[in-house]
């Protein structure tokens, strides 16, 4: 009795014969047309067409989309047109001047030091000069700035200064010379791993800030993707994820795929699933995201990470040292967010925010050392010896790590729980009151310390302008237009919530008398930047802002620049 395989083969015999006939005809047709060409011509045409196909593929499938490049080219050509281009440039120059004037914080009677003094100054003279510089700062001590300074408490400052001083000359690059500093950094990482419920194989690194922490995670997953054969690794991140992911994509030759949000300003998990491709190197969640203070659904995204075997990074730079204490503070979160969630492979958390360490201190943590190894840079062939560094920097200030360790030890678990309790209590009170003010609304359901406001009745940047006039410094956001206030321990202890609400109510009442009025000042510039289709022009204006930071030219001072574009 014939086998099943033999019967199936016999059934397909007619089709195989038909296929053979057509393949023979195709072969004869091609050979017939090639007889009129010499062999060298066939080879030349094959090479040319191969190169054209490769060029076409690379041209179409670049990290930046074809449509985006087409728009840039059109805008560039438009700006070169005689009449239209001149008008655009005139308006652009005026806006640049406005930004430069608003960036001039130097008083009229002050000048910049542009050369070394011929004779060195005494210690007292240097300190007196620095005191003059510090007096130029805005009065952040009053608790009117969004985020920025997260404690500022005098006794803590004294402790941090002393800790930094004791390690001022130390450098983690030389663990053999500074073993105490190595111990400090190892302890900081292990404490953080414990707080985020990492297992025995969890690990991490101390970095200079949230941006570097994010960059390091992206670099690790890029190299992991390279090992898997992915040539153009993609970062799939929510629209609200920090701009540092764009910076990582730019620095490391990756492509970022932004995923839309739901009405509650959380990442749309279905859209994220659709965005996953064979080139996806990592997924991203925020806890919370910077613009609106909303926590992404980490467990749901983690399921995608497990299903498709893709690393998941949780960006907790802003709220990391709040969320780990929320439950003990009496404000438990609805879903887990850390290494307890299967699929979470890395977390970034800033100790220089709600960890109350000095600026320049952050952490990137991994669930397993196998991921961290991809972050490291090692050069085995340098003439100066084998060069290996865990993060971007080579030399780093040991004093910052010492001060970070001091802050962790000084607060302890109870101190952090109490601080979290004060901050969240203040934030929840503000949120409930702001939701009841007619003319504005709160974005999403912020559960931590950031509250974002919008309006359906007027340009929200007008509210930012009026609050600036009252001495507040809020952050301006875009897509959609909004502003936010980040509550810190300084705000909670200064009890500024009542005054903040009073000023918001007064400002909204004033605006609602003429809700359609146009925004002026920096609010208008920010609004214009959001509606400008040519994003290269916006980037050009942003460069003016960055240039101004290092300018030593004396410029006539304009009105105060509100809604700082920088993150906390």
Curated annotation (Swiss-Prot):
Membrane topology: Single-pass type III membrane protein
A Gene Ontology biological process term: Leydig cell differentiation
EC number: 4.1.2.27
Cellular location(s): Endoplasmic reticulum membrane
One GO CC annotation: endoplasmic reticulum membrane
Predominant place of localization: endoplasmic reticulum
Cofactor(s), names only, from the UniProt record: pyridoxal 5'-phosphate
Cytoplasmic side: 62-568
CDD domains associated with the record: DOPA_deC_like (cd06450)
Involvement in disorder: RENI syndrome: An autosomal recessive, steroid-resistant nephrotic syndrome that manifests in infancy or early childhood, and progresses to end-stage renal failure within a few years. Additional clinical features include ichthyosis, adrenal insufficiency, immunodeficiency, and neurological defects. In rare cases, patients present with isolated primary adrenal insufficiency. Some patients present in utero with fetal hydrops and fetal demise.
Protein purpose: Cleaves phosphorylated sphingoid bases (PSBs), such as sphingosine-1-phosphate, into fatty aldehydes and phosphoethanolamine. Elevates stress-induced ceramide production and apoptosis. Required for global lipid homeostasis in liver and cholesterol homeostasis in fibroblasts. Involved in the regulation of pro-inflammatory response and neutrophil trafficking. Modulates neuronal autophagy via phosphoethanolamine production which regulates accumulation of aggregate-prone proteins such as APP. Seems to play a role in establishing neuronal contact sites and axonal maintenance.
Name of the protein in its database record: Sphingosine-1-phosphate lyase 1
Species, as recorded: Homo sapiens (Human)
Upper classification of the organism: Eukaryota, Metazoa, Chordata, Craniata, Vertebrata
């Amino acid at each position: 009795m014939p086998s099943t395989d033999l019967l199936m083969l016999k059934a397909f015999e007619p089709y195989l014969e038909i296929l053979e006939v057509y393949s023979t005809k195709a072969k004869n047709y091609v050979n017939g047309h090639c007889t009129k060409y010499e062999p060298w011509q066939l080879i030349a045409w094959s090479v040319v067409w191969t190169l054209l196909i490769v060029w076409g593929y690379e041209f179409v499938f670049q990290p930046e989309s074809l449509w985006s490049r087409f728009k840039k080219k059109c805008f560039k050509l438009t700006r070169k047109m005689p009449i239209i281009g001149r008008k655009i440039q005139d308006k652009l120059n005026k806006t640049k001047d406005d930004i430069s004037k608003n960036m001039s914080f130097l008083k009229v009677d002050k000048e910049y030091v542009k050369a070394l003094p011929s004779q060195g100054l005494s210690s007292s003279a240097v300190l007196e000069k620095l005191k003059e510089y510090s007096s130029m700062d805005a009065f952040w001590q009053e608790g009117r700035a969004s985020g920025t300074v997260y404690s500022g408490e005098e006794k803590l400052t004294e402790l941090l200064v002393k800790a930094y001083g004791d390690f001022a000359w130390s450098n983690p690059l030389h663990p053999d010379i500074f073993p105490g500093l190595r111990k400090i950094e190892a302890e900081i990482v292990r404490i953080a791993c414990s707080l985020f419920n990492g297992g025995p194989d969890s690990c991490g690194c101390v970095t200079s800030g949230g941006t570097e922490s994010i960059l390091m995670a992206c670099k690790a997953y890029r190299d992991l993707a390279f090992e898997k054969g992915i040539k153009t690794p993609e970062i799939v991140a929510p629209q609200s994820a920090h701009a540092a992911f764009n910076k990582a994509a730019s620095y490391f030759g990756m492509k970022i795929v932004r995923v839309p949000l739901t009405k509650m300003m959380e990442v749309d998990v279905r859209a994220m699933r659709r965005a996953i491709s064979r080139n996806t190197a990592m997924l991203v969640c925020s806890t919370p995201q910077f613009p609106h203070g909303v926590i992404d659904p980490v467990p749901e995204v983690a399921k995608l990470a497990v299903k498709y075997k893709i690393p998941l990074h949780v960006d907790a730079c802003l709220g990391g040292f709040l969320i780990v204490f929320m439950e003990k503070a009496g404000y438990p979160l609805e879903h887990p967010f850390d290494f307890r969630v299967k699929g979470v492979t890395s977390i970034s958390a800033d100790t220089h925010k709600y960890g109350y360490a000095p600026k320049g201190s952050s952490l990137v943590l991994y669930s397993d050392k196998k991921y961290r190894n991809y972050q490291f840079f090692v050069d085995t062939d340098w003439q100066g010896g084998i060069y290996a560094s865990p993060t971007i920097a080579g030399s780093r200030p040991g004093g910052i790590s010492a001060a970070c360790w001091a802050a962790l030890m000084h607060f302890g678990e109870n101190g952090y729980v109490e601080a979290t309790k004060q901050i969240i209590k203040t934030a929840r009170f503000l949120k409930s009151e702001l939701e009841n003010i007619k003319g504005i609304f709160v974005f999403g359901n912020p559960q931590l310390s950031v509250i974002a406001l919008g309006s359906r009745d007027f340009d929200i940047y007008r509210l930012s302008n009026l609050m600036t006039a009252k001495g507040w410094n809020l952050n301006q956001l875009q897509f959609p237009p909004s502003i936010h206030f980040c509550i810190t321990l300084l705000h909670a202890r200064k009890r500024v919530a009542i005054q903040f609400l009073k000023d918001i109510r007064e400002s909204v009442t004033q605006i609602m008398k003429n809700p359609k009025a146009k925004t002026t000042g920096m609010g208008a510039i920010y609004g214009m930047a959001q509606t400008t289709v040519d994003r290269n022009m916006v980037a050009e204006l942003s460069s003016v802002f960055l240039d101004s930071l290092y300018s030593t030219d004396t410029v006539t001072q304009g009105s105060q620049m509100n809604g700082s574009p920088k993150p906390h």
